[in-house]
Amino acid sequence: MPSPDLISWPGRSPEANQAYGISDPLRITYLLVMEDERLDRMTAFQGFGRGWWLLIWALYQLAELPAQVLEPTWPLDSLLRQRIGGASGLSWMPIMASALDSLMLDEVGFCVVMFTGTEPAARRAAAWAARQPRPVLHVSSIATPRTMTPDAMNLIVLRDHCRAVYQAHGGEISPDRRARALEAIEAWTPRQPVSIDLDELGHNCTTPNHMVLRRAGRSLGEGIPHWSSIDEDAYTAAILASATAVMDVRKAVGTSNVNRLFVPLPKIVLTEPALFRFAYGRGDSRGTSLAPATVMMIRRMQQQKGLAHLIEPKQLSMLEHDGEWQGAVAERQTETAVQTAGVGLMAAQSCAAVVRLRPEVNHVFPRLSEFARNIRAVNPHARAKSPQLLQRLQDALARAVGPERIDFVRRYGGPVRIVSDAPLELLPIDGLPLALRYDTSRINATPGNLMMGELAGRVPITVDYRDLLHVLVVSSFNEDDQLRDFMREALDQLEEVRPGEFTIDFRRVTTVDEFVEVVNGSTAPIMIFDGHGVQDDGRGLGGLRIGGQTVDIWRLRDRMRCPPIVILSACDTHGLDAPSHSTVGNSFLAVGASTVLATVLPVGGREGALFIYRALLHLAGFVPAAIEVRMRLISWTEVMAGVLRLSLAKDVLDHLTRRGVLPDESDRAIFRGVLRSVLDADSDWFETMMGSGHRTGTDIRSHDCHPKRWPSLPLRWP
């Protein structure tokens, strides 16, 4: 839907105004322009474009640049409160040179800064800038007469550029905004940083928090470049010391009523780089053209579990006599450095603490595979082991993360964002999975390019909850499929319970062309897919079953316009044990979805329909109540977290009622108590339910109703 405050740009059609209207011409837009790259040229282990390494300096610079022209004049604490609350985020994005060529400046922003790191990208970016109606500041590591070098770029240079833009072209915006912009620009001065007692250890495990602290106006203590240790505990201490320093800033700043206007962003980011899933395979070193030292170093990367690096004398001797291995190690170091800078930039925009994990979290996948195979077993006696296998998986996760990091999360609470491939949603926090304890969202670490696009984020969109009651439901079940009618029946029941409240567009499709036509023809902000999902079988293809064929959603990117919210009621759309990153959930993100709710395990047709029924009922009833109780906006992550918690509570209480554990009608009273706890955003909501049985004379805690009995948790992205 168009912005309520569009700016009509001279020379642009009304259609373009609707599509590209900029509601805030005081915002500064930053573009990282890269050369076009083929997929087969991405980095080997995590899938980054090779242009990222040549722009890593730009990520660090962005962390200290203002989001808009008024920002440098605001009191620091007031600015930080806005950032913590979800406002004043940077508008930045990576873009290929060919895509830039197809854009007009007005489609990008009013005041624009470009960064380039290669000669071809710099040349094309400069040519594009020369065609635009307003000047564009071009910062490049490639020295040309029309570019600014990274070393010369600073707040004063940016100020002078912004002043020139608003003086010469301020007539294109409203007079009051032009006056405000020019008045603020004249008052720009570098802030005097606040010193804190934290040494600047030069290591990628602490760098993200250093970026956060510098953007928060803090200066660090003694710099120790290229810091390292042979003691794993030293890394843990350094990570948590830097993360605690960020939390101290948040505590000192506090919140104000302005935070009610914005959604709360994650306060903790859990991150760990990963290899492509297939890259963990040992393979057969016999017959390989790689030198033994190179094979040895790749194996070390595959098997690494801690941050401390120890190498045996024999291995060291191998490295001394062969230099080929350096290329593989350098590539992996580059990937890690890019993720480090990207995560740091994302966290810096909301003053979030970054907790780097240990590579051991990526080694729980054998446990995942064992658990997932058991869930899929046809024999019900085999599936009886599922709770035990889930417990083993959670224990392995807890060991990999470590008690110190878990204590940090417990101490400060959520919201939490995961930037990792590991299933950290299942990490036990006081007996409850992380995703049920705290509001949790995720960005996958592979492929790297997709991760960086998600880290760039988007300008938040605020809507009335009633706008979300228009839903497209696409069903692809065959006519003879026994699961075909469960969703339709659930939606009919929803209409009986909440008559006239929803606009449900239910469409059945039998071909890929029909699917694309239905999705493109809908204006609903939410799409629910009801059908069969197919997990990657090891050949790099996970998809949806439509018309008897498996459809790779990624291949529809040039044909399909994806709605912002996608909910997948299909099996294994981001499988726990998927052998590659090519999942349905990832694919919908890659083709344009803002958020995806995917499944990590098989789901029954009846259970999937029940979940959708509850989720939509939740939108209509819980969301307005939560807004009233919390007296602020709520995020989509909070909405979905509420669905998961209340669904689990309802399942537990129904289970106990069927067993005769709870007296008649007492389950409703207990559920109302849980509902109040969830409405209050209480992370102890599960304990509230477990203890509330005392009012009915029942000790719920003495019965087997732990969440491990309900292991099929959906997975969600921000």
How would you name each of these model-derived features?
Residues W9, I142-T147, N444-L469, F529-A620:
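Catalytic cores of nucleophile-dependent amide-cleaving enzymes
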Residues K385-L389, T511-D513, L544-R555, P564, ...:
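General structural signal for secondary-structure boundaries
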Residues I28, R159, Q167-H169, P175-E183, ...:
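Active-site-proximal C-terminal subdomain of hydrolase catalytic domains
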